[in-house]
Amino acid sequence: MPDINNDVVAANFSRASRSYDLVAKIQKECCYKLVAMIRERLPHFMPASVLDIGAGTGYLTKLLLSEFPNACYTMNDISYEMLSRAREMVGESVSTILGDMSKVKFPVSDLIVSSMAIHWSSNPITVLKRVCRLSKVFAFSILVQPSLYEWNRLFHELSLPSPGLHYISSEEVELAMLDTSPTLFTWEVCNFDMRFASPKEFIRYMRQLGSNYSPAGFNAYHVRKVLKHAPGEFFSKYSVMFGVVSRSHF
C-alpha cells in the first residue's frame, strides 16, 4: 500500500471542517451503528476512559457522552480545525490529541473507538492491532474493498491510473483482530449506496467531506477526461466493516 501524505490529508480535512457535517450523512449513520453495537454486544460494559481516534468533528464522541456520561474522554485527529469543531460540539472538558494516528503514543483506555478513519493510515493493519492492544474494548468502522470501486473504474476504462485509496479487505481486518487474542470479536460489513447527478457532483461531495485525497496526486487533465467520458448519473458505494473487539471479560 503506498504511503499517504499526511500533510495533504490534514489540509483537506481542515478545509472541510465547516462543510463536513452538512454532507456526512453516511458517516453519522456509521457512528450510530457503532454505538448500538457496543451496547448490544457488551450491555454491562461501563468504561471509565474513552479515546476516539480520527474523531473528526466529534460526532461519535457526542453520542458516547450520552451513553457513558461519567467517563473521561479524549479525541484525536490529524486536523487542528477538525478538533476545534469537535470541541465546539462536545465542550472544552474533553481532552484532545493532535496528530497522525500511526505516530501518536495513545494512552491505554477502557474503550477506544474509531469510525471511518483508520483507512487513512498508510498501514491500517498495524494501527488496528496497536490500538486494540491498548484497550479493554475496541470498536471501529473502516472502509474496506470494494469501496468506491466505481470511481476507480471510470479511470481504468480510459487506461488512466486509479486516483483512489487502496482499501484493505474485510478478511485482512478479521485476521488482524483475531491475532490480538480477543475474548470477543463480532463484525459485519454493510454497503451504503450513493447516487450523484454526475461524477462532478461526486467530486464536490468528497471535497466537502475532506476525503478528496489521491495517492497518485490530483491530475486535472485526467479528471476532465473522465468527466467528458461519463457525463450522466454516477453511482457508487461505501463498503464499511464494523467491529467490536473485547480483550477482557465483562
UniProtKB/Swiss-Prot annotation:
It is an enzyme of class 2 (transferase). Keywords: Biotin biosynthesis, Methyltransferase, S-adenosyl-L-methionine, Transferase. InterPro entries: BioC, Methyltransf_25, SAM-dependent_MTases_sf. Transmembrane segments: none annotated. Pfam families: Methyltransf_25 (PF13649). Pathway: Cofactor biosynthesis; biotin biosynthesis. GO terms for biological process: biotin biosynthetic process; methylation. Its EC number is 2.1.1.197. It catalyses: malonyl-[ACP] + S-adenosyl-L-methionine = malonyl-[ACP] methyl ester + S-adenosyl-L-homocysteine. It comes from the Bacteria. One of its GO terms (molecular function) is carboxyl-O-methyltransferase activity. Belongs to the methyltransferase superfamily. NCBIfam families: BioC. Converts the free carboxyl group of a malonyl-thioester to its methyl ester by transfer of a methyl group from S-adenosyl-L-methionine (SAM). It allows to synthesize pimeloyl-ACP via the fatty acid synthetic pathway. This is Malonyl-[acyl-carrier protein] O-methyltransferase. It comes from Neorickettsia risticii (strain Illinois).
